[in-house]
Amino acid sequence: SGNFGEATLAPMFTKDYSNLGSSDCMKVIPDSTLAKNYSGYSSMLPADQYQSRLAVMKEDVNDTAHNYHHDKSLSYGSYTEQTGQMAGDCVDINTENPSVVKYLTDAYSKYLDMGVDAFRMDTEKHINRWTLNHAFFPVFNQYKNFHLFGEVCARYHGAYNEGGSSDSCFFYTWSETESAWQNNWSNSDWKSNYDNSVKHFQAHQNRSFDQTSDNVYLNGLSYHTPDYSKANGTSTIDFPMHWAFKNASAAFGAAKGEDSLYNDATWAVTYVDSHDYGPDGQEKTRYQGGASAWAENMDLMFTFRGIPCIYYGSEIEFKKDVPIDVGPNAPLDKTGRAYFGDHLEGSVTASDYGKYTASGTVASTLDAPLSKHLEKLNQIRRAVPALQKGQYTTDSNYVDGNMAYIRRYTNSSVDSLACVTISGDATFKGLPN
């Protein structure tokens, strides 16, 4: 949570919503731990106020319920990246505390009860997989037609992150299949859960993950029912593919190199840049490769395995080559996180999927070359089931080409096969009639 506490986990302030333009809108709660143990708070320097708030949230004497992790340091590639504080405004909630788990799952279940289709779990890497599999995912997996995918930040080339398997994208798609990590969550003892989460991270710091899956691959040219007996029902953002997106060919190679380690990479969310990072080599700015490269990137994301995700404005190369995040050192308008709403002014009336009339500035936005390209890709993907959820092959017995593949999806009423080449020539062989 933020470092000003949280209404239930660490109540410190009330807020006067009629006076949000002033720092005086924040009022210390009279009977709070902050008021009682740090009575001189209002006269402290800002740095001392910050330390006082942290002490309320992270010291044993104050946070007696252990609603927060009390670790004082964080080292990437070690278990402390899941128990430490990753930033000043990100105080680490104790996800191993059963009462905290109930509070969080009850809160997010309200969104699911309202019909939310999916969650993107931010900073999933900073929660242990054993914890998620025992305490969180079973709650959310009860909801039908709901998809949860997480951000496991892995700014590395290849499938493995700095902590080995433990903090790698593919790792978070699997259930606990080893007996040592099954049925040992405590509904009363947070310390037991904490200790187990640490041991779980340390036990999986290898770079030779011993589970693989063929769920994403065709068997020859035949689709087969995926085996989800070891899946945990969630997926992740494909960070290794993103990191390799200096061009589409490199991203394609990165994806193929990791796919057997996911339980099913068909569900991985693919993207080029975001509110945090661009690809390696241009990670501090929004993508700058140009319209032709963008078109090729989109071609790959919308026809290869995975669920494509486009950062707002990419369809007009909004803020290309502009620094994404410089903290408080520039107005948002000068960054890659700038407001995009000006480009959406006007009206849109849709008559069908991809069919619409528009007026005002939004009409120009929708008429941009990449917008039109994206519109057509969406229509193609929607019309071809194999491109939505099919398995794939790049086996040279069936396909030759730089970025070429075959995808197929079948069920009792559908047999959809797509031959795809992104750039350059390709040869397809042995296709069924």
Where are these regions (language model features)?
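Active-site mouth loops of central-metabolism enzymes
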Residues: 89-103
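Active-site-proximal helices and loops of the catalytic beta/alpha 8
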Residues: 106-264, 268, 286, 290-291, ...
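Short, basic, glycine/proline-bearing loop/turn elements
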Residues: 272-286
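Glycine-rich, aromatic-lined ligand/substrate-binding cores of catalytic
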Residues: 274-277, 300, 308-312, 316
